[in-house]
Amino acid sequence: MASEAEKTFNRFAAFGESSSSGTEMNNKNFSKLCKDCGIMDGKTVTSTDVDIVFSKVKAKNARTITFQQFKEAVKELGQKRFKGKSPDEVLESIYGLMEGKDPATTGATKATTVGAVDRLTDTSKYTGTHKERFDESGKGKGIAGREVMNDNTGYVSGYKGAGTYDKKTK
């Protein structure tokens, strides 16, 4: 059960921190873990309680907590959340709440293709000259797909289209 709690701890510790290794958690992510896992219920355990417990268990000049400090914080919050239970039962209850949880990303926008957007972005449905702008895989050809390119090489600077002289005279 503790290993599952440690995995959840690591997932929340790394959430939103690109440079984080996931071994230490800051106050913001600790509050998020408590809220998302249901440890903070808003009545017996509030966000203020979570912040106070975080400040108690972290080192004096540190900004983050390790998993060992996290276990102490969870015990303290659990005593408040589950009154009348033994410390071991409290820890098991908290770990049960945390089991298999991931950081929730509510309010994050997701790309959707609806109606016209789907039709306009699918290059296989293009017609006319527009369909020549893309290869079979749907990747754009660039300027080669938009314009007819003449080869501007020849013996004289004004002569355009090398190799076309023989075709004209015959």
From Swiss-Prot:
Pfam families: p25-alpha
A GO biological-process term: spermatogenesis
This protein's UniProt keywords: Cell projection, Cilium, Cytoplasm, Differentiation, Flagellum, Spermatogenesis
Domain of life: Eukaryota
UniProt-annotated location(s): Cytoplasm, Cytosol; Cell projection, Cilium, Flagellum
Location of the region described as Disordered in the Swiss-Prot/TrEMBL record: 127-147
SUPFAM superfamilies recorded: EF-hand (SSF47473)
Entry GO CC: cytosol; microtubule; sperm flagellum
Biased composition (Basic and acidic residues): 129-139
Role this protein plays: Probable regulator of microtubule dynamics required for sperm motility. In contrast to other members of the family, has no microtubule bundling activity.
Family as reported in the entry's similarity comment: Belongs to the TPPP family.
Stated name of the protein: Tubulin polymerization-promoting protein family member 2
Source organism: Macaca fascicularis
Lineage per the UniProt record: Eukaryota, Metazoa, Chordata, Craniata, Vertebrata
